Amino acid sequence: MTNIRKTHPLLKIINHSFIDLPTPSNISSWWNFGSLLGMCLTIQILTGLFLAMHYTSDTMTAFSSVTHICRDVNYGWLIRYMHANGASMFFICLFLHVGRGMYYGSYTFMETWNIGVILLFAVMATAFMGYVLPWGQMSFWGATVITNLLSAIPYIGTTLVEWIWGGFSVDKATLTRFFAFHFILPFIIAALVIVHLLFLHETGSNNPTGLNSDADKIPFHPYYTIKDILGVLMMISFLMTLVLFFPDLLGDPDNYMPANPLNTPPHIKPEWYFLFAYAILRSIPNKLGGVLALILSILILALLPFLHTSKQRSLMFRPITQTLYWILVANLLILTWIGGQPVEHPFIIIGQLASISYFSIILVLMPISGIIEDKMLKWNL
């Protein structure tokens, strides 16, 4: 008798995606982050659902409803901090997942990569709107500053900002619509994830060498299911350590003060995972230029397939580009640090130099080093 998982219309899809999927035998732990991101999304949707049962999206009661969740709801504090720190875990996994893709040349799977870039934008938008919901000082002023950036768009800027606000300032209408979008976007993300996987399974996974692995494939289950479970256990251990011992480590103390339009916090800054982009935004003195640089800092990922000059896919055997890659990683850490610092000397010039370096490495140096490496191997004939 044929196995039901191979014949049933629904189980057949699951079987081809997670059980009998032919997978390269040599993929390392860097390939674990896809499943970890799926786990993060599941955690965020579930905790978010339970938070939404008790949250009220009204400027008068939003802050106190979050306090009520933490104090009066059974395990509300746990759900709230799992959701807040789960977002940080989400971004840690996202950055590592994208970094893996850049290192091993996974961006040559164009459709998968582009859906991934769209997913990154969607997750960033969701996280930004979620940060506004507790209606603390940093929520309010973060929303004001970031939405205000759209006013830099010529002609329609001001109208666009007021349309997004639903009035002449960030107020009740803004909070309500942000809650609505924050609720719906994760489900759109989940749908995009399915499309992301669909395109990935058209080509099969990449591997550390960047070479074709058709000659050496193994079934996903049990080899990679058990490997993914180990990754999930490690991630959940780290998340729960954060939640139970250091719940406010990555948050801003200003957000424990209710939103007050009459009192601006001394340093308005986003959550840590946006600081690198925020530093790039601030490093350009012109408002429109800053906004364009901010968008381009993420959108540049979509250009990677066109900037690939080497005849080798992965950086595994390319020491010059490898060095540039790790300089880029260090550069992003510097940008993250600068984004959290006040706008004063020497932070301004450091931020500007780091921003120039960021774009130079990706747009100029890495493509050149790819050509040089090919010449050194006499592959440019």
Curated annotation (Swiss-Prot):
Residues the record lists as binding heme b b566: H97, H196
Going by the entry's taxonomy, the superkingdom of the source organism is recorded as: Eukaryota
Give any GO molecular function from the UniProt entry. Answer: metal ion binding
Name where it mostly resides: mitochondrion
Q: Does the keyword GTP-binding apply?
A: no
Keyword list, A-Z: Electron transport, Heme, Iron, Membrane, Metal-binding, Mitochondrion, Mitochondrion inner membrane, Respiratory chain, Transmembrane, Transmembrane helix, Transport, Ubiquinone
Pfam families from the xrefs? Cytochrom_B_C, Cytochrome_B
Q: Could you name the Gene Ontology cellular component terms for this entry? A: mitochondrial inner membrane; respiratory chain complex III
The Gene Ontology biological process terms listed for this entry are: mitochondrial electron transport, ubiquinol to cytochrome c
Q: According to its UniProt record, where is this protein located?
A: Mitochondrion inner membrane
Annotated heme b b562 binding lies at H83, H182
Q: How is the cofactor bound?
A: Binds 2 heme b groups non-covalently.
- Write down the membrane topology: Multi-pass membrane protein
The keyword Methyltransferase is assigned to this record: no
Q: Which cofactor does it need?
A: heme b
CDD domains in alphabetical order? cytochrome_b_C (cd00290), Cytochrome_b_N (cd00284)
Q: Where does a ubiquinone bind?
A: H201
Gene3D superfamilies per UniProt: Cytochrome Bc1 Complex, Chain C (1.20.810.10)
> What more is known?
Heme 1 (or BL or b562) is low-potential and absorbs at about 562 nm, and heme 2 (or BH or b566) is high-potential and absorbs at about 566 nm.
Family membership noted in the UniProt record: Belongs to the cytochrome b family.
Function as written in the Swiss-Prot or TrEMBL entry: Component of the ubiquinol-cytochrome c reductase complex (complex III or cytochrome b-c1 complex) that is part of the mitochondrial respiratory chain. The b-c1 complex mediates electron transfer from ubiquinol to cytochrome c. Contributes to the generation of a proton gradient across the mitochondrial membrane that is then used for ATP synthesis.
Q: How does it assemble?
A: The cytochrome bc1 complex contains 11 subunits: 3 respiratory subunits (MT-CYB, CYC1 and UQCRFS1), 2 core proteins (UQCRC1 and UQCRC2) and 6 low-molecular weight proteins (UQCRH/QCR6, UQCRB/QCR7, UQCRQ/QCR8, UQCR10/QCR9, UQCR11/QCR10 and a cleavage product of UQCRFS1). This cytochrome bc1 complex then forms a dimer.
Could you identify this protein by its name?
Answer: Cytochrome b
Q: What's the encoding gene here?
A: MT-CYB
